[in-house]
Amino acid sequence: MPELPEVETVARGLAQVWDGRTLVRVECRRPDLRKPLPPRFAERLTGRRIERVGRRAKYLVVGLDDGLVLLGHLGMSGRMVISQGRNEPPGRHDHVEFITDHGISVTYCDPRRFGLLDLCGRDELSAHPLLAGLGPEPLEAGFSAEMLAACLAGRRSPIKVALLDQTLVAGLGNIYVSESLFRAGIAPTRPADSLKAAEIGRLVPAIRDVLTEAIAAGGSTLRDHVRPDGELGYFQHSFAVYDRAGEACPGCTCDIAGSSGIQRIVQAGRSTFFCAHRQR
């Protein structure tokens, strides 16, 4: 599932062709996504000018000139694909197509149909069921060691599991939590409330750095993620521990023969990768 860097990459790609443009046609070919499309979906969007494409957690947020907001989640396999003057017939998984006044087509393609598109008023956005209760954005200025320490207080769950809780920090997922904990030198199995102030002080900038670098690389393409312009993400080539079980982590001095290198365990049904030598 796309995490914060992948969704941010998609939002930035869409902003380049959508910001300030008018939707002249919206074609809905299959309304039964994870959540059915809202009534009069195409009608309510047609003729509206897009003011800004943004992101909240793992959701695309598209503000329109009449106060309406298009909210999107890519699910497991969803993509937003940009094309100019598209002439070929739509593919079987091309469920919604948005055409702007300068001839650009953006197609929502989702083979597994776990994604969704919804509409709500701008004033209702923060209370939308998908967004209400989300934690702070880790790349915003207010996300600090003090804030994270307060969130972790009293939490006995492993720190890896705690950081995946979207009410604690918004947008983090399996890949980037594993990478951030490695950079901070913190074992993923540690109880969240056992982290000392100095450790949290390392973790916050580690989270920021990992996310910033991943966005700069266009996200991580492991299976489905593709940028709107068709390019792949490249941060997977910079993974220190994720999906590298049995290998040596960068700069590690442990005995691979004795330690088996990077370890993989399962936490809350998800794979966790870490170096037991460098993460305590």
Task: State the predicted function of each range.
Residues 22-40, 54, 149-280:
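Basic, nucleic-acid-binding surfaces and adjacent catalytic neighborhoods in DNA/RNA-processing proteins
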Residues 36, 47, 57, 78, ...:
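Glycine-centered flexibility motif
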Residues 70-171, 176-183, 191:
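Phosphate/anion-contacting hairpin/loop surfaces
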